[in-house]
Amino acid sequence: MGLTYQLLPALVCLLACTSFIQGCKYDITLQEIIKTLNLTDGKGKNSCMELTVADAFGPKNTDGKEICRAAKVLQQYKRHDRSLIKECLSGLDRNLKGMANGTCCTVNEAKKSTLKDFLERLKTIMKEKYSKCS
């Protein structure tokens, strides 16, 4: 029982697309996060970048819990800040929550860093994750 010649190209395309999609689950989300973080760099002169936030990152920065914690920190910051940077952070917050995939987490408020340092560290982590996807 052979495949008809009309069906064969469709199956090849389907297989190729499936393997491409499975390469990295959050490829587009990571690109969007990195782009947003690059935009916030330009606003580094803003005084809100010197505000202190909870430092959500551990030494390895690889598990989903740390992404969840980063989303929580940004969510807490958004509640208290009314500046223009809030618009950028809302998209960032949404993307991080999506990557955390509904993971529940808590943030240790004892360790603090500036918002600028927090965002720089987050950008480094996202770039590392993106490089692993490529």
Curated annotation (Swiss-Prot):
<dbReference type="GO" id="GO:0008083">
    <property type="term" value="F:growth factor activity"/>
</dbReference>
<keyword id="KW-0339">Growth factor</keyword>
<feature type="glycosylation site" description="N-linked (GlcNAc...) asparagine">
    <location>
        <position position="101"/>
    </location>
</feature>
<keyword id="KW-0325">Glycoprotein</keyword>
<dbReference type="GO" id="GO:0042113">
    <property type="term" value="P:B cell activation"/>
</dbReference>
<keyword id="KW-0732">Signal</keyword>
<dbReference type="GO" id="GO:0050776">
    <property type="term" value="P:regulation of immune response"/>
</dbReference>
<feature type="glycosylation site" description="N-linked (GlcNAc...) asparagine">
    <location>
        <position position="38"/>
    </location>
</feature>
<keyword id="KW-0964">Secreted</keyword>
<dbReference type="InterPro" id="IPR001325">
    <property type="entry name" value="IL-4/IL-13"/>
</dbReference>
<keyword id="KW-1015">Disulfide bond</keyword>
<dbReference type="InterPro" id="IPR009079">
    <property type="entry name" value="4_helix_cytokine-like_core"/>
</dbReference>
<dbReference type="GO" id="GO:0045893">
    <property type="term" value="P:positive regulation of DNA-templated transcription"/>
</dbReference>
<keyword id="KW-0075">B-cell activation</keyword>
<keyword id="KW-0202">Cytokine</keyword>
<feature type="disulfide bond">
    <location>
        <begin position="24"/>
        <end position="133"/>
    </location>
</feature>
<dbReference type="GO" id="GO:0005125">
    <property type="term" value="F:cytokine activity"/>
</dbReference>
<dbReference type="GO" id="GO:0035771">
    <property type="term" value="P:interleukin-4-mediated signaling pathway"/>
</dbReference>
<dbReference type="InterPro" id="IPR018096">
    <property type="entry name" value="IL-4/IL-13_CS"/>
</dbReference>
<feature type="disulfide bond">
    <location>
        <begin position="48"/>
        <end position="88"/>
    </location>
</feature>
<dbReference type="GO" id="GO:0006955">
    <property type="term" value="P:immune response"/>
</dbReference>
<dbReference type="GO" id="GO:0005615">
    <property type="term" value="C:extracellular space"/>
</dbReference>
<dbReference type="GO" id="GO:0016239">
    <property type="term" value="P:positive regulation of macroautophagy"/>
</dbReference>
<dbReference type="InterPro" id="IPR002354">
    <property type="entry name" value="IL-4"/>
</dbReference>
<protein>
    <recommendedName>
        <fullName>Interleukin-4</fullName>
    </recommendedName>
</protein>
<feature type="signal peptide">
    <location>
        <begin position="1"/>
        <end position="23"/>
    </location>
</feature>
<dbReference type="GO" id="GO:0050728">
    <property type="term" value="P:negative regulation of inflammatory response"/>
</dbReference>
<dbReference type="Pfam" id="PF00727">
    <property type="entry name" value="IL4"/>
</dbReference>
<comment type="similarity">
    <text>Belongs to the IL-4/IL-13 family.</text>
</comment>
<comment type="function">
    <text>Participates in at least several B-cell activation processes as well as of other cell types. It is a costimulator of DNA-synthesis. It induces the expression of class II MHC molecules on resting B-cells. It enhances both secretion and cell surface expression of IgE and IgG1. It also regulates the expression of the low affinity Fc receptor for IgE (CD23) on both lymphocytes and monocytes. Positively regulates IL31RA expression in macrophages. Stimulates autophagy in dendritic cells by interfering with mTORC1 signaling and through the induction of RUFY4.</text>
</comment>
<dbReference type="GO" id="GO:0005136">
    <property type="term" value="F:interleukin-4 receptor binding"/>
</dbReference>
